């Protein structure tokens, strides 16, 4: 009975969210995403005030078409009030937003499923779920062309779970095989509907893939940004990156989790990027807090991306052009 009720609530929330907002390129052929990550918000804790301040400053400056939260939104109780406080900063501006969970979100007294139901009640929410596969926040956000006639960009959102579930293997969990198959099936569907041509796509989740460390340690890889710590990636590689290369659609992957990294490195033709830590001093951090911005141009390969902090921007690069130029 509980499972049936949860499923009905999910369906209601999904239908409401999808009917309320359609993502599309604007008349100038642009679509802008702001990525907030690791807000680590604690309700009524003065150390979190700067995170709300920065969120609003970034939104004032960038005026995005979509806000993506890539996990660890909250870091203390009461969980519901904390989640609402953070997401309402975006919702009150009538900006569509979406969330994927991090390893700390469900450690504050509410499960992922309970947090998901709360998020569904917040206006302008696009967070969804896919029944029957591992995790809660697995869903797709298509971005329509400026005339609304076709899917021009696909945003894949995945749940990277929390901690390893395999005895004897420590650290963090990997994105599971059924999630990878779900991605592959949908990628094939979109490619087939697009006359056999992959639709440019981006992916968002919380915990970095093992390929981040491989790329960051390669002398031949071009990197922009700051790397102050090794990626806390899963010890085991479940093959998501290989699938994305095989499908040929994903141009960029955006994660959080490692607070002292904000770099973006090109690896095997794909941009592996971190967001900028958005939180306050509720947890470790050694970078001025801010956000990553991603600007897509309709009909153009790649994208432009930069970091926005208090009163300034940095690391403004165009992918893949800036990386190919730096390699020469």
Predicted feature residues:
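His/acidic metal-ligating clusters that form di-metal
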Residues: 63-65, 154, 169-262
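N-terminal active-site segment of His-dependent metallophosphoesterases
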Residues: 20-85, 89
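Beta-strand-turn-beta hairpins that frame and shape the catalytic cleft
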Residues: 22-33, 136-157, 265-272
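Active-site environment of divalent metal-dependent phosphoester hydrolases
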Residues: 42-44, 75-80, 99-110, 163-166, ...
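Acidic/histidine-rich helix-loop elements
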Residues: 34-52, 73-81, 107, 165-174, ...
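Extended active-site neighborhood of metal-dependent phosphoesterases/phosphodiesterases
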Residues: 84-196, 292-297
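Binuclear metal-dependent phosphoesterase catalytic core
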Residues: 36, 142-145, 240-247, 261-328
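Bacterial N-terminal signal peptides
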Residues: 7-15
């Amino acid at each position: 009975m509980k499972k049936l009720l949860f499923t009905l609530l999910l369906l209601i929330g999904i239908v409401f969210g999808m009917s309320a907002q359609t993502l599309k390129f604007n008349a100038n052929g642009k679509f802008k995403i702001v990525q907030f990550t690791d807000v680590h918000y604690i309700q009524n804790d003065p150390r979190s005030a700067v995170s709300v301040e920065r969120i609003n400053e970034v939104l004032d400056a960038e005026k995005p078409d979509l806000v993506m939260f890539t996990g660890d939104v909250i870091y203390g109780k009461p969980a519901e009030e904390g989640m609402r406080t953070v997401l309402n900063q975006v919702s009150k501006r009538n900006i569509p937003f979406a969330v994927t969970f991090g390893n700390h979100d469900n450690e504050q007294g509410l499960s992922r499923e309970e947090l998901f139901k709360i998020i569904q009640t917040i206006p302008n929410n696009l967070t969804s779920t896919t029944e029957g596969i591992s995790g809660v926040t697995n869903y797709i956000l298509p971005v329509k062309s400026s005339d609304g006639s076709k899917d021009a960009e696909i945003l894949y959102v995945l749940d990277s779970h929390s901690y390893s579930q395999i005895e004897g293997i420590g650290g963090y969990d990997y994105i599971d095989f059924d999630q990878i198959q779900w991605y592959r099936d949908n990628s094939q569907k979109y490619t087939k509907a697009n006359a056999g041509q992959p639709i440019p796509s981006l992916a968002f989740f919380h915990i970095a893939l093992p390929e981040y460390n491989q790329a960051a340690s390669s002398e031949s890889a071009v990197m922009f940004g700051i790397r102050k710590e090794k990626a806390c990636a899963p010890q085991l590689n479940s093959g998501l990156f290989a699938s994305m290369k095989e499908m040929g659609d994903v141009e960029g992957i955006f994660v959080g989790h490692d607070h002292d990294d904000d770099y973006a490195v090109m690896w095997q033709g794909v941009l592996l990027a971190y967001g900028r830590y958005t939180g306050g001093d509720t947890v470790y951090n050694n970078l001025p807090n801010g956000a990553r911005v991603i600007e897509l141009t309709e009909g153009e390969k790649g994208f432009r991306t930069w970091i926005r902090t208090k009163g300034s921007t940095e690391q403004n690069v165009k992918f893949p052009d800036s990386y190919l130029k730096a390699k020469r």
